[in-house]
Design a protein with these regions (language model features):
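Extended, folded cores of ATP/NTP-driven motor/assembly subunits in large transport
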Residues: 1-400
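Short glycine/proline-enriched loop/turn "hinge" motifs that connect secondary-structure elements
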Residues: 23-29, 102-107, 318-323, 415-417, ...
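The start of beta-strands in P-loop NTPase/AAA+ ATPase cores
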Residues: 31, 109-111, 469, 629, ...
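Hydrophobic positions in the central parallel beta-sheet of the AAA+
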Residues: 35, 113, 442, 631-633, ...
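P-loop NTPase motor domains
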Residues: 40, 47, 51-63, 263, ...
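Short, cationic low-complexity segments
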Residues: 132-161, 354, 446-451, 796-823
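Conserved P-loop NTPase motor cores
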Residues: 428-461, 470-479, 496-504, 636-756, ...
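Conserved P-loop NTPase
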Residues: 751-810
Length: 841
């Protein structure tokens, strides 16, 4: 059936002529250069930084010639998260993590900037001369070629000023990004479909009716700020966000944030600044002032307006500020009537939050939408703008965006604080490359119950799956589930869990190496180990004793290297010293006061066959930990044992130092949990100090986790080694320490900005999701708060609740059962319970 209603084609009314060399040329001979704008991330900007951004915008706009238009468009489009499950090599937990966020809605944000050079005549036109209202468009020719060249030079200056600001980056759009290609839609196409999809943009009919505008099924509502009476009495660059502020800290957002990311519906927030002839504006104002003065006796409002106009003129002349015209609008859309009513009310409420008067505009929606076409800002109706100064106009610019994915191939997945979707964060390599940090070491501080274990499990799992060697030192069995999961997945090749139990005591063989070779580091570690067994912590060996011990170790190594039939272990070493080495020192006539061999053997006897600790150094398992990628030393049962703990400590350090030196080009991490307190002997302190200062040279990182910062500073060596050599600081919920946070701030050298971010942790968590927030600071210059949200599968793997761990083991059928199968069942059960709670019948 033929359409009998009068319809107009988009082609006939289309205001753009072409895109040449990245410049949009309109049929009215306007030139427009388009940029994509990279704004700072939400909740990471301070009041001073907002001021600096504001100042940069002002400097940049001032370089543009007269009759230029600055149009900044912030697009906020609802989308759903698409999990990255294409990689066939994904582990069970990685896949579970991605699927946990499947189809989670979020508000995607893109910011574009259009700099347009128009003419004096065009800038004065009203809505009745808009290209929508004219019968036909005849392309005009650019008559002043020099003006076009000057404008393009000014645009380059504008771009350079903004990029040099350090807060905002502009990227000039290429021709294909504006016009699109056969495979991908361009920006203009996206505007006509109100979509940010890169794959397809479905063009739909545009319906213009009195009081209503539709694009396909999307119904548009428009709120405008087009009069000074709509604005609050005072504009500022930023505002305090109460939900994440405390009486001791501030969380700042840009003044226009309520109509930005805080407005959770599909919308475009457009900000226009029109640069006219400043002298002409002031002359017009002078004339208006005189007219109102002459008419003031007839109306009080004329007198008031004359007074305001005089104040405007005084401000312009005394401070030399630039008079401009300004307009802002929010175009929101929805597909059904109920949602349309909701977004209309929400938009009005958010404008009211800015202390602006919400003006719901129905008549001018098509005209203002049409002027928002990229490159068509010169078509904006002049009666919809108001006079102000550049400083005030720029206050209405939205100043933040969503969290961004790091471009680095390495990193961890954490959740966006605003939308709750995964973001890729690199806290090691890229910051190092950019000079933000000088080492990869990390200091993690969080009280009990703040989510430390979940965060560290989440961290080390992702490091391991990206090829890193992980060595964990723990008390409390926090990593038991993850270690067993890795052990099962690798069929025992990885996931080595070393702990002390009565029926399965901890045991090593310091004389075993997979290659049968003993380098200098291995010999030194054996010497240090035996010296620790022989001498008390406060007892220093004589030089002659050190020489004798080194000689014994070297002689025994020579013997076992020459005769491979000898099984090397501590028992063999003890017997070698008892017989062979005794003979050797007698031949050398070593005096007893220089080396008391009988006293030496007497002290070491408990570790020899039949002694109380004969299990410790005589393991029959041929296990070289250097090649194992995930090792957990669980020290809970020996943390107070003065004999076992020093020995195990040395084994740990020897293992990691061997990894450091031998594994070239492979990432290494040692993570020391709360047990570091028990390891703070004089020897261990020196090890920690050495480790934190040198691990960066071997592509490694040392991580210390603690509940109390005071525990760290009680040891001057540790304070100097750990805090001063950890450029990455990670803090969890500090609300229970809020009254003494100044102490923590001083010890860790935190800035006021970082303090505000840390104290905002968990202040405004989403009620429908279970997660804990974590603050990550890099080098004192780059910091943000993220959410540690894990899947149900990860939850049951990482949990430290004893009842939940026992339930997992029960369903798995004991240590030999299928842990993955048990976790799948429990996770599914938990999801079903959550569905029943959220959807009760």
């Amino acid at each position: 059936m033929r359409n009998v209603l009068k319809a107009e084609t988009l082609e006939r009314r289309f205001p753009l002529l072409s895109v040449e060399n990245g410049c949009i040329v309109s049929k009215d001979a306007d030139l427009t250069v388009a940029f994509e704008v990279e704004l700072p991330e939400l909740y990471t900007v301070t009041a001073d930084e907002y001021e600096a951004m504001h100042s940069s915008w002002i400097k940049a706009v001032k370089v543009l010639p007269e009759h230029s238009v600055v149009c900044k468009q912030d697009w906020f489009v609802k989308e759903t998260y698409r999990p990255k499950t294409d990689d066939g090599e994904q582990s069970f937990l990685t896949r579970s993590y991605e699927l946990h966020f499947n189809e989670r809605p979020y508000l995607n944000h893109k910011c574009y900037l259009f700099l347009t050079k128009t003419t004096r005549e065009r800038s004065r036109r009203k809505s009745d001369f808009n290209t929508l209202c004219r019968g036909f468009l005849l392309p005009k020719e650019i008559t002043d070629k020099d003006a076009a060249a000057r404008f393009l030079e000014a645009v380059e200056q504008f771009e350079r000023i903004m990029n040099d600001s350090g807060h905002i980056r502009l990227r000039r759009l290429e021709t294909d990004e504006i016009t699109g290609t056969k495979e991908r839609p361009g920006l203009v196409e996206k505007y006509f479909s109100l979509s940010l999809e890169d794959e397809t943009a479905v063009l739909q009919d545009i319906c213009l009716k009195p009081g209503r505008m539709r694009i396909g099924d999307k119904r548009l509502c428009l709120h405008t700020l087009s009069d000074t009476e709509d604005l609050p009495g005072r504009l500022s660059t930023d505002m305090r966000y109460e939900r994440m502020s405390t009486d001791r800290s501030d969380c700042r957002l840009s003044f226009a944030a309520p109509v930005g990311l805080l407005l959770s519906c599909n919308h475009i927030y457009s900000q226009y600044v029109f640069i006219d002839d400043a002298q002409e504006i002031l002359q017009m104002m002078e004339k208006n002032s005189r007219n109102m003065l002459s008419l003031s006796k007839y109306s009080r409002s004329n007198a008031i307006n004359q007074e305001w106009t005089e104040m405007y003129l005084d401000e312009a002349h005394t401070k030399g500020v630039l008079p401009v015209r300004c307009h802002c609008n929010v175009i929101a859309w929805a597909e059904d009537a109920e949602e349309f009513r909701r977004i209309r009310n929400d938009t009005g409420s958010q404008l009211a939050m800015m202390e602006c008067t919400p003006r719901y505009n129905t008549i001018d929606t098509p005209v203002i939408y049409w002027a928002g076409i990229p490159g068509n800002a010169g078509d904006f109706p002049s009666e919809e703008s108001f006079y102000t100064f550049l400083e005030q106009a720029v206050c209405l610019f939205a100043g933040e965006t969503n969290y961004r994915n790091s471009p680095s191939p390495f990193g961890i997945r954490l959740a966006d604080r605003q939308n709750g979707i995964p973001v890729h964060v690199d806290i090691s390599d890229l910051p190092m490359k950019r000079g933000i940090i000088t080492n990869r070491n990390k200091f993690i501080l969080g009280p009990s119950g703040s989510g430390k274990s979940f965060f560290t499990n989440h961290l080390v799992r992702q490091y391991y799956e990206q090829g890193a060697h992980i060595l964990l030192v723990d008390t409390g069995n926090s990593y038991q589930g993850l270690c067993r999961m890795i052990h099962d997945r690798t069929n025992g090749k990885d996931g080595i869990y070393i702990t002390y139990e009565e029926d399965n005591p901890i045991s090593f063989n310091p004389f075993y190496t997979e290659s049968g070779k003993f380098d200098v580091e291995k010999r030194d570690s054996i010497n240090t180990l035996i010296l620790t067994l022989w001498k008390r912590e406060d007892e220093s060996p004589k030089r002659s004793e050190e020489v004798a011990l080194s000689g014994a170790v070297n002689a025994y190594i020579r013997k076992i290297s020459e005769n491979r039939n000898i099984r090397p272990d501590f028992n063999g070493f003890y017997e070698f010293v008892t017989e062979d080495y005794r003979r050797m020192i007698e031949e050398k006539k070593v005096r007893e006061k220089d080396f008391d061999i009988d006293g030496f053997l007497n002290v070491l006897e408990p570790f020899y066959r039949g002694g109380d600790y004969d299990f410790l150094l005589n393991s029959d398992k041929e296990l070289d930990l250097t090649g194992k990628r995930f090792i957990v030393f669980e020290l809970d049962n020996i943390s107070s044992n003065k004999v076992l703990l020093p020995v195990v400590t040395l084994i740990i350090m020897e293992t990691f130092i061997a990894k450091m030196r031998r594994l070239k080009g492979i990432r290494k991490m040692i993570l020391i949990e709360e047990c570091w307190k028990a390891l703070m002997s004089a020897n261990m302190s020196e090890y920690i100090k050495y480790l934190f200062k040198t691990v960066r040279k071997y592509f490694g990182e040392a991580v210390v986790v603690t509940q109390e910062v005071d525990d760290i500073i009680s040891s001057p060596i540790v304070k100097e080694a750990i805090i001063n050599n950890s450029d990455c600081k990670i803090l969890l919920d500090q609300r229970k320490y809020i009254n003494k946070f100044e102490h923590i701030q001083r010890l860790l050298g935190l800035t006021e900005k970082e303090k505000g971010q840390i104290l905002s942790i968990n202040q405004a968590n989403h009620p429908g999701r279970f997660y804990r927030e974590v603050w990550i600071g890099l080098g004192g210059t780059c910091s943000a708060v993220y959410a540690t949200e894990v899947s149900e599968e990860e939850y049951f793997t990482f949990t430290t609740e004893e009842s939940e761990k026992l339930e997992v083991q029960r369903i798995a059928g004991g240590p030999e059962g299928s842990l993955e199968g048990a976790i799948r069942r429990l996770a599914e059960k938990k999801r079903e319970e959550q569905k029943q709670v959220s959807n009760p019948k």
